[in-house]
């Protein structure tokens, strides 16, 4: 499968937490979220379909649907959550989410018909959908969502989890196409530790705790100079460059730093993981700019750094305690009301939603993976 290739006031307010001398007024994390509202207006149709306009097929993906579910939950919008979930179930799961994992790609085919374009699965989208369902069930007291989240975890266990020799239980990127003659292709960005922790809590007899521990090894050993690759291949003993894609870290790998930066301080894997992924921070400290594409074996980049990548690095730089670097990257990301923000493509907008939203304290992850949305805090509850 091939896949894919805001904010000054809000983000700088988050930066102020690391910059005590900065005279920056913090906006209320309880108030309207302009960046999310703009995303909804542009990318989410009334029926709940999330559209990526960058591609001619005007595609929708399980990833896009999963992120929309997550941010609808962060924004406490049950109506939108229900619409996005309904579209996902009917169009990606064939109307039977209890039996079918969602197809990863839906859009317009060459004849102009709208349909599933690739029935293979993508475990990153499914993991986030399961997470959103579990947390929506808990936070909104909707037991049907808890059951649906459990059902999806069971489907993922059955179809996308394998025990790799020399490594142990691992989440494969999808149902088919990632195992070839004793070699397993993995995507490090599909392994957010906090999401796996929540899965382990919801399914304690499942493989999720082991996958989380093994994921730390994937992230460490596939990043020999501190840069995560988009894809890596395990041969039973070592991690190797993907033969088709090479040692490249780009639009997938940027999320590895994002997920690591958002880990709770109580996560036992956090400190070592941030150390293992020091590449982008080291480049910035050397007054160099991380690039669009990084040769992960040499730490050498090509292409201008996309704005969304800067947004994704915000939690990471915050976690590393790098206030000057954090401020510099925050200043690259346009405010939600600026034309430059409106011009950002779908994927960069999602990175900005994750990075900016976290820095603005609109949500956090607990050490056990639970979502801690701002709207559940006493301060926000008092404003409603």
UniProtKB/Swiss-Prot annotation:
GO terms for molecular function: cellulase activity. Its EC number is 3.2.1.4. The active site is at residues 63, 124. Keywords: Carbohydrate metabolism, Cellulose degradation, Glycosidase, Hydrolase, Polysaccharide degradation, Secreted, Signal. GO terms for cellular component: extracellular region. InterPro entries: 6-hairpin_glycosidase_sf, 6hp_glycosidase-like_sf, Glyco_hydro_8. It is found in: Secreted. Coiled coil: none annotated. GO terms for biological process: cellulose catabolic process. It catalyses: Endohydrolysis of (1->4)-beta-D-glucosidic linkages in cellulose, lichenin and cereal beta-D-glucans. The keyword Protein biosynthesis does not apply. Residues 1-25 form the signal peptide. Transmembrane segments: none annotated. It comes from the Bacteria. Its main location: secreted. Belongs to the glycosyl hydrolase 8 (cellulase D) family. Hydrolyzes carboxymethylcellulose. This is Endoglucanase. It comes from Xanthomonas axonopodis pv. citri (strain 306).
């Amino acid at each position: 499968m091939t896949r894919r290739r805001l904010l000054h006031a809000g983000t700088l307010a988050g930066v102020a937490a690391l910059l005590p001398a900065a005279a920056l007024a913090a906006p209320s994390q309880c108030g309207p979220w302009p960046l999310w509202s703009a995303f909804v207006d542009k990318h989410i149709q009334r029926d709940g379909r999330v559209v990526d306009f960058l591609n001619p097929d005007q595609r929708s993906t399980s990833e896009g649907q999963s992120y929309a579910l997550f941010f609808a939950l962060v924004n406490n919008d049950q109506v939108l959550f229900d619409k996005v979930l309904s579209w996902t179930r009917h169009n990606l799961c064939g109307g039977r989410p209890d039996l079918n994992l969602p197809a990863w790609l839906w859009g317009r085919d060459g004849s102009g018909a709208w349909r599933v374009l690739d029935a293979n699965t993508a475990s990153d989208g499914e993991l986030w959908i399961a997470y959103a369902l579990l947390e929506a069930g808990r936070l909104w007291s909707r037991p049907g969502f808890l059951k649906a989240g459990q059902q999806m975890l069971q489907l993922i266990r059955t179809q996308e989890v394998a025990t790799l020799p020399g490594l142990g239980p691992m989440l494969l990127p999808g149902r088919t196409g990632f195992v070839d003659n004793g070699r397993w292709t993995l995507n490090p960005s599909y392994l957010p530790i906090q999401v796996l922790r929540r899965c382990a809590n919801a399914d304690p007899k499942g493989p999720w705790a082991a996958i989380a521990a093994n994921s730390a090894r994937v992230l460490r050993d596939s990043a020999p100079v501190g840069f995560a690759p988009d894809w890596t291949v395990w041969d039973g003993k070592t991690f190797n460059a993907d033969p088709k894609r090479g040692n490249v870290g780009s639009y997938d790998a940027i999320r590895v730093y994002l997920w690591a930066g958002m880990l709770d301080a109580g996560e036992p894997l956090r400190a070592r993981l941030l150390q293992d992924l020091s590449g982008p921070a080291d480049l910035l400290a050397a007054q160099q700019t991380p690039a669009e594409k990084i040769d992960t074996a040499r730490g050498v980049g090509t292409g201008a750094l996309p704005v969304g990548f800067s947004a994704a690095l915000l939690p990471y730089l915050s976690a590393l305690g790098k206030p000057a670097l954090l401020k510099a990257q925050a200043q690259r990301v346009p405010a939600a009301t600026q034309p430059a923000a409106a011009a950002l493509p779908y994927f960069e907008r999602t990175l900005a939603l994750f990075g900016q939203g976290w820095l603005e304290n609109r949500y956090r992850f607990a050490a056990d993976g639970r979502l801690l949305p701002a709207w559940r805090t006493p301060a926000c509850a008092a404003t409603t």
